[in-house]
């Protein structure tokens, strides 16, 4: 809505965080917010069960996220508002208020994973995907059109990089 965007612009925010709060964590790891599901043609984006449905009881099953407003649209909004984007990515934990589901970080903590070595540290391949998602988001924002993710951004209509400088990791994680 143009009126809301104009009201936000009048506030002159220095940055805009997205997505907010527990939505990034999901009810569980499977339905966490994943930025890659929010880019590309809007009609081809998957839907996700919304964390704010409170529970998986039948009366809330139709409370979904459509991803019609995805990371690409969010970065465009930040450009319009003339503020820095602060995208937030999941850190491998579900909402700790609801549960304790975590992705094992180190290969030695996982019985099924041989891992990926980075600077002498062996991470589980499952956790490495979170690292790769962050690197891919940076490429989507800052890469030129010859890169995979920079090329997607360019094909969506934004040839110039977004010049991302901030990145949020996780939300209200305790004991992490």
What are the roles of these predicted feature ranges?
Residues 1-176:
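Non-catalytic accessory regions flanking glycosidase/transglycosidase catalytic cores in CAZymes
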